[in-house]
């Protein structure tokens, strides 16, 4: 929790300059670097990664 107050972002992406305060946020961000769309609408062509 204190990382939020001090601005510490120890979890860094190895593909871009993104950094965050916890590993789960980094894991979510890493999906942006893939071409995998996990969630697709059954009624139209809409799809999203997360």
From Swiss-Prot:
UniProt cross-references to InterPro entries, sorted A to Z: Znf-C2H2_CTCF, Znf_C2H2_sf, Znf_C2H2_type
Protein name: Protein hunchback
GO BP: any one term: regulation of gene expression
GO MF assignments: DNA binding; zinc ion binding
ZnF endpoints (C2H2-type): 1-5, 11-33, 39-50
Family per similarity comment: Belongs to the hunchback C2H2-type zinc-finger protein family.
Gene3D superfamilies for this protein: Classic Zinc Finger
GO cellular component: nucleus
């Amino acid at each position: 929790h204190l990382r939020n107050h001090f601005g510490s972002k120890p979890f860094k992406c190895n593909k871009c300059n993104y950094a965050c305060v916890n590993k789960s946020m980094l894991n979510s961000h890493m999906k942006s670097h893939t071409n995998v769309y996990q969630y697709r609408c059954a009624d139209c062509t809409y799809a999203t990664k997360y």
